[in-house]
């Protein structure tokens, strides 16, 4: 029985082959390979097969060629000894092959074929791979694998122990081993417990098989994870604790217990904000490294959406121009070297793209005070926050991967510096008392504020867009997922992606009321040339008629006798005064007033000082 078994050579059986049940063995194997021995596999033939992408076939034919070059008697004797020893160890090690010690002698420079089931994938002719020259695997078969006995150079093969059961390879779980893996990495003695459920795939070097992404591990092993969903590992390096944002501005020297650190800003002044990646992934080059961040000014208190929109609308109604924004970004060269795709997505928010492999830097100014949201005088202003949300292009979600904030207080006319000086003065006075009383140590002045991370990533921020400009703003519903091919180079500047959904962010109450703007008042400071003190002329309406009424009331000049009114600029240009000059270019200006009477009418000349 054993001799008959040795005379049979292993065969390749396809599962979906019609002759699957009709197995037969070839006893006269020397005649079967006689033609092959007469036409040996030359180096040129191997090179041509490698160029055509069939390196594995070249390796297999070379293995068979070396096997059948050996005389039949030596081959049968070596195979019999190996077979007897392997059958004894087969039941002990659950079918794992063992190599005989005799086969490792220097004289045995052959490779013995063992009938160990090993799965390869046979491609069908009607399915073509995405790359064109490779085919998509479809059928799994059990073939024999050769154990390296002795070669002249270092062997690149490895032995794999598998259960002797023929089964179809599940398409959802594939493990592909590289041919360059050393033999000591994968042997029959160090297989993991679940190795029986992982059958080696074909060694075709396909990058994509049935749209399953391939994950590369340096330097010599690549795993194609078919059972893992793409959302589980795509952009896995972007985690909530991997970002840090810093604002270069002065912080309060007297923080209140339990409150966040207060940062003082001047209205309209630009401050740099640096965005970078930190943690264990710092320094690792990301193949897809673009992220989008949104910097916005929001209210610190937990106010409802309606209250926030009401405050923003009140602030916007009191601005000199409808184009006034709550937050602006500077076009500094230092900033634009690190960011791209800048979008003013709302009056209180700015979006841009930056690279994780480099630090992003932007210069931001805030144009609203904390006291601008109420008409009452002397009330404490509403606290404001600078909030930064960072979104990944790969997580296919409108939920940010990181969110952080810092509390700010905005002053006008260099008020931030005055506030810091006042706190320093109070702190210096307290130091004298601390020496005697021994109070808590004072805080040192720092000009760097680190944004504090937020755990709530689900709440959508309120973005303010005035009704008059709502239709002109470019925005979309969600962050659109983009393929890695689109991210290889610079993102297309024309791509407009917002991480917000517009559902009810900017909806106004059902009953809209027209906004009634209070008439703008113009104040002029005038004096006669013979006088030293200025008089204030308050124009009830910013028109030429309003100016005539104010002059008539102040200097008792009959309004019906006032003729021409001129304005003399600092350059000496004399122009006719009209409504536009009074409304837009004369508020709180100082003038010399000259009143001349000629022919029963008065001519007024306002000379700009």
From Swiss-Prot:
Keyword line = Activator, Developmental protein, DNA-binding, Nucleus, Transcription, Transcription regulation
- GO cellular component annotations of the record: nucleus
Superkingdom as given in the UniProt entry: Eukaryota
Q: Coiled coil located at which positions?
A: none
Residues covered by the Grh/CP2 DB domain: 239-465
Specify whether Cell division is a keyword of the entry. no
Q: Where is this region: Interaction with DNA?
A: 371-380, 418-421
Where is this protein localized, as stated in its record?
Nucleus
Q: Where is the composition biased (Polar residues)?
A: 185-206
Please list where the region (Transcription activation) is annotated.
Answer: 1-91
A single GO molecular-function term is:
DNA-binding transcription activator activity, RNA polymerase II-specific
Which family, according to UniProt?
Belongs to the grh/CP2 family. Grainyhead subfamily.
- Function (record text): Transcription factor involved in epithelial development. Binds directly to the consensus DNA sequence 5'-AACCGGTT-3' and modulates expression of epidermal-specific genes, including XK81A1. Important regulator of DSG1 in the context of epidermal differentiation. Regulates the maintenance of skin barrier. No genetic interaction with GRHL3, nor functional cooperativity due to diverse target gene selectivity during epithelia development. Functions downstream of BMP-signaling cascade modulating endogenous bmp4-responsive targets.
Name used for this protein in its record: Grainyhead-like protein 1 homolog
């Amino acid at each position: 029985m054993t001799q008959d078994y040795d005379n049979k050579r292993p065969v390749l059986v396809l599962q979906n082959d019609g002759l699957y049940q009709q197995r037969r063995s070839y006893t006269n194997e020397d005649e079967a390979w006689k033609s092959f021995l007469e036409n040996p596999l030359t180096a040129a033939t191997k090179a041509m097969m490698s160029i055509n992408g069939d390196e594995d076939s070249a390796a297999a034919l070379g293995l068979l060629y070396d096997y059948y070059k050996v005389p039949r008697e030596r081959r049968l004797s070596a195979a019999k000894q190996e077979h007897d020893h392997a059958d004894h160890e087969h039941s002990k090690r659950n079918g794992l092959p063992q190599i005989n010690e005799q086969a490792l002698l220097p004289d045995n420079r052959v490779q013995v074929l063992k009938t160990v089931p090993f799965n390869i994938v046979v491609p069908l002719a009607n399915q073509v791979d995405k790359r064109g020259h490779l085919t998509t695997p479809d059928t799994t078969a059990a073939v024999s694998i050769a154990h390296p006995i002795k070669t002249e150079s270092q062997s690149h093969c490895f032995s794999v122990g598998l259960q002797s059961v023929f089964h179809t390879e599940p398409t959802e779980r594939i493990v592909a081993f590289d041919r360059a893996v050393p033999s000591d990495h994968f042997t029959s003695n160090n297989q993991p417990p679940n190795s029986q459920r992982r059958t080696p795939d074909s060694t075709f070097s396909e990058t994509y098989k049935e749209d399953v992404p391939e994950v590369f591990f340096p330097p010599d092993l690549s795993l194609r994870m078919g059972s893992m969903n793409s959302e589980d590992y795509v952009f896995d390096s972007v985690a909530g604790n991997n970002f840090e944002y810093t604002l270069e501005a002065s912080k309060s020297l007297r923080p209140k217990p339990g409150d966040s650190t207060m940062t003082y800003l001047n209205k309209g002044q630009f401050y740099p904000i640096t965005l970078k990646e930190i943690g264990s992934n710092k320094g690792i080059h990301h193949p897809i490294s673009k992220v989008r961040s949104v910097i916005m000014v929001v209210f610190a208190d937990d106010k409802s959406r309606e209250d926030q929109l009401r405050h923003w609308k009140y602030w916007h109604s009191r601005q000199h121009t409808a184009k006034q924004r709550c937050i602006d970004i500077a076009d500094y060269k230092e900033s634009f070297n690190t960011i791209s795709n800048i979008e003013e997505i709302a009056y209180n928010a700015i979006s841009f793209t930056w690279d994780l492999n480099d630090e992003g830097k932007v210069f931001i100014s805030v144009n609203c005070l904390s006291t601008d949201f109420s008409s009452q005088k002397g009330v404490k202003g509403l606290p404001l926050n600078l909030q930064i949300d960072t979104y990944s292009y790969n997580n296919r979600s409108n939920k940010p991967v990181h969110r952080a904030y810092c509390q700010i207080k905005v002053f006008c006319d260099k008020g931030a510096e005055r506030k810091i000086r006042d706190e320093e003065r109070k702190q210096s006075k307290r130091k004298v008392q601390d020496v005697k009383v021994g109070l808590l140590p004072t805080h040192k002045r720092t000009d760097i504020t680190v944004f504090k991370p937020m755990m709530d990533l689900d709440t959508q921020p309120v973005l303010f867009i005035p009704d008059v400009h709502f239709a002109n703003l470019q925005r979309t519903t969600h962050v659109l997922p983009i393929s890695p091919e689109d991210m290889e180079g610079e993102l297309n500047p024309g791509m407009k992606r917002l991480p917000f959904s517009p559902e009810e962010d900017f909806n106004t109450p059902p009953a809209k009321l027209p906004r009634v703007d209070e008439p703008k008042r113009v104040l002029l400071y005038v004096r006669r040339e013979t006088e030293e003190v200025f008089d204030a002329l308050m124009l009830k309406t910013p028109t030429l008629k309003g100016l005539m009424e104010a002059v008539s009331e102040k200097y008792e000049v009959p309004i019906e006798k006032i003729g021409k009114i001129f304005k003399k600029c600092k350059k000496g240009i004399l122009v006719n005064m009209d409504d536009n000059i009074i409304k837009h270019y004369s508020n709180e200006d100082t003038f010399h007033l000259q009143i001349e009477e000629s022919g029963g009418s008065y001519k007024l000349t306002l000379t700009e000082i």
